[in-house]
Amino acid sequence: MLFRSRLFGACVDVVGIVNMQTFLEKTSDYRRKLREVEYGPLSDPEFLKTISPIHKADKINVPVLIGHGFNDPRVPVEEAMQLAVALKDRKQSPRLFIAPDEGHGFQKLENRIYFNERVVQFLDETIGARKPMAIPNP
């Protein structure tokens, strides 16, 4: 999205990591060790900054819908909040849905239905509804 933004008309972020440093700082010790192997060590904040989308938020020039569970044990909800604030600071109007009774992702049926309805509505409004493809007869 950040590097090919002109290809996209909208963005839906679900439980996304946006700031690698704050993500690692707020992650449990055992999970941090696993993630540092994948993303880089917390002891190298300059590198983490280079791979953190939050520091490139000025390149996001399309509407954004953000979804997150308030009790997410893997990606703290603060990640979603940081993105929403960064976009608002740039005069954008992100849509934010925080499910108060969810963890990582939307597991409860009512939350999945609600969020997916918001996604469809958001995409209809931002990139437009498309006609369904005709399915050829076999």
Predicted region positions:
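Active-site-proximal cap/loop segments of hydrolase catalytic domains
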Residues: 1-138
